[in-house]
Amino acid sequence: LIGLMVYFLMTSLGEMAAYMPVSGSFCTYGSRFVEDGFGFALGWNYWYNWAVTIAAELVAAQLVMSFWFPEVPGIYWSAIFLGIMFGLNVISARGFGESEFWFALIKVVTVVIFIGVGLATIFGIMHGVESPGFSNFTMGDAPFVGGFQAMVGVAMIAGFSFQGTELIGIAAGESENPRKNIPIAIRQVFWRILMFYILAIFVIGMLIPYTDPNLLKNDASDISVSPFTLLFERAGFAAAAGLMNAVILSAILSAGNSGMYASTRMLYNLALEGKAPRLFSRVSRSGVPRNALYATTLVGALCFLTSAFGDSTVYTWLLNTSGMCGFIAWLGIAISHYRFRKGYLAQGGRLEDLPYRAKLFPFGPLFAFALCMVITLGQNYQALVGERIDWIGLLATYISLPLFLAIWLGYRWKKRARFVRYHEMDVSPTNT
């Protein structure tokens, strides 16, 4: 369901980004097609989302490095990796692009090998490894262990894993020939989701039962409990734990690197639109908005809270906060696209003139909006139904919602902003 939702969201974003490529992406679209305060709140929410994600990834890096160096304090590793991410982004956009290419290559090769080994095991090709068939899907409470509550609870984490797909829209403002390249990138999203997410999860479900004692350890710092590691070890790869640890580290650096790029560009665009202090609009000779980069790096330093509260606790806080912010951003994409298409047609626009058209409109954005709402509001409803209300749990899960509403409504009240009517929308592709 999350994969299908993300696919519809990316086709929605692709339609707008190919027609109107801007660095502000869906935040600019929110201002143009919904209401100025809505775009303002989306922009700050998205900057905060990725800035916090950087901190979350740096905490994850601490957990990964503890596998090799358990005696070294985690904050040292966070400082080192924060410096690496900063260095890759401060040079130029090319530095970000080159590093992401190699990070992505490592992940792609690993997932392809994982799927290949998994399928070979499923079909009984791997020598000495017995195929469980479909038994793991039929045993006990499988495949829907925990029922609806568990599905909603895990949806936020699944959504966190998909976050970053919307970077296509952010990069559109700096890409060459976006009217041609954005549609190509969007069309590849379906196959990437199918192969790298759905197929990999299918392989894990087929080969590793939910009752596996390794999965119940609940130790985030133990790489041996990773489903990827378990599968490789059972296929006879003795060094699987160390290898997967290195791959996961590269994935963490990739996610943090992307977060640094996205949040910096978002803050820069907010400054250009007058929605953030003007000092964040200044760029270096190589085109890097360094003041925005400095501010983002400062928020990323939240990872150092682990020295006071513990790495696993801080990681959970940051993961919940970032996950909720990501779903708010996706809600903004769905709303903006629905209104863009309506406004575009209301002003006499022709679908044939769009460089890319989202499939199954209006079902796509409406489905994505509805599912986002269910997951966002129902994420931690169990905190309300127990004998005592878990106020700390509620705060950790939902803090992003009141912050978003406060920013939106505060801006709306101060600027006297109003919703944009379909006939008044700026749908000009050249006014970017």
Regions found by a protein language model. Give the residues of each.
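Hydrophobic transmembrane alpha-helices that form the core helical bundles
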Residues: 6-90, 95, 249-252, 256-266, ...
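Helix-loop-helix connectors at the membrane interface of multi-pass transporters/channels
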Residues: 27-37, 58-78, 110, 169-179, ...
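TM-loop-TM module centered on a large, flexible mid-protein loop between adjacent transmembrane helices
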Residues: 28, 35, 67, 154, ...
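Membrane-interface loop-to-helix entry segments
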Residues: 75-132, 163, 186-194, 319-332, ...
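Non-transmembrane, juxtamembrane loop and terminal tail segments
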Residues: 419-432
